[in-house]
Amino acid sequence: MDINEIRKKAENEYMRWISHLTPNDEFYEELHELKNNPDECLDSFYSELTFGTSGLRGILGPGTNRINGFVIRRTTQGVANYLLGNIKKPSVIIGYDSRKGSDFYARETASVLRGNGIKVYLFNELMPVSLLSYGIKYLSCDMGIMITASHNPKIYNGYKVYNNQGHQIVGKDPQSILKEIEKIDFFSGIKYETDGIKEVPEALYRSFTKKILDISTNVNQEILNNLETIYTPLNGAGGSFVKKVFNSIGYSNYKVVKAQEFPDPDFKTCPQPNPEKLLAYNEAFGLLDSDGGDIIVATDPDSDRVGVALYHEGVRTLVTGNQLGILMLDYLCHVRPPQRNQKVYKSIVTSPLVDKISKKFGLKVVEKLTGFKYIGETIAELEKNNSLNEYYFGFEESNGYLAKPFISDKDGVSSAMLSVEMAAFHKAFGKDLIDRLNEIYEEYGN
């Protein structure tokens, strides 16, 4: 198809959307404004967002190549058809983060599933994606759906799909779902019902928190509270959960960045809410400069990743995802010695230092493809074979960690807790995290 054919196709689809949207529909005004911006119109309609192993992710706006209610509802009808074609009485749990439209898209997703007679649990507040992963198995659901675009800029949102084991779909599932989606029209054949959507039970929250606390390394209270932490949820879903966990382990010597404490879909003080970027810590460093402190801990908007930054020798320093994972592994090996036959699971692009540390402590290393879903798939296999005790630690270089296999996904809440306990432990010996990292480099090389 040449460019003229592509333009014609986009124009035809644009006119179809013009004929269907009413003033009450989302992005109605933006749709009509596209006639004055042909390049943007072309980009919005020349193709469709493609459903894959990460579900959907795209820019918010009108069009087939954007995230909007019509795309979400169509996708969900395809998901419903897939479920009903494979499971007699399916059930789904749905969550969402702090992004623009996330709560609306979560409700629309729930309503389409209910219209198809599917049992639906919907969180009534934003929450970490790890809680969704845990909830899938806790409530014996066949699928989980999370409305999120993780740490992308504010113009994005997305739609992640998890299987009944609590990790993102892999294998043939994405392609099978895509085939069902492609059969659906954006404006017809989509079932919809708002009644019968179930709230997630409070017991799930309590059980999830207990599992997080089981990961604690139980640092002495005096040592723990000698560490001063600045915490930022980067205007995302992690705030209340991380604070609750800090308080539950008896840790009170922390301050939260006020401008980033509560949900803000515009991410006004952190245009790139990504804990892998030093820029994301600017507000936190400002608080550290004025009030003092030892480290900054940040969780991303859906709170499945954690990052750490600090002043080392007077310089603002970001602990990279690889470095933080190495530090966690080193720390755990010293305070919670591995048992025989336990393994570390890492992505193929993760630091080879993992292998050297693991060898010293008798751990085997298993490499997986990039993406924590492949580690999650392994966790599901271990559970199926009653071998979960083989799991010691798992991480990927992009700041995703899991210290115990209580879910099949990475978790920023428990990793934030572990980061604080680890930093407090090393501070008791007069070292910050970079000091300890340099000692590791001296011992193993880098």
Pin down the residues of each PLM region.
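Short beta-alpha connecting loops at secondary-structure transitions
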Residues: 158-169, 194-197, 265-272, 308-317, ...
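Gly/Ser/Thr-enriched, mixed-charge loops and adjacent short helices
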Residues: 17, 22, 40-45, 49, ...
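Short glycine-rich phosphate-binding loop at a beta-alpha junction
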Residues: 90-97, 228-231, 342-348
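An N-terminal, well-structured beta->alpha segment
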Residues: 3-109, 116, 198-226, 237
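Conserved phosphate/anionic-ligand binding catalytic regions in large, soluble enzymes, centered on
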Residues: 45-65, 149-150, 229, 233-245, ...
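Phosphate-binding and adjacent anionic-ligand microenvironments
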Residues: 293-295, 335-336, 340-446
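N-terminal small/polar loop signature for handling phosphorylated ligands or for N-terminal nucleophile
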Residues: 93-156, 252-308
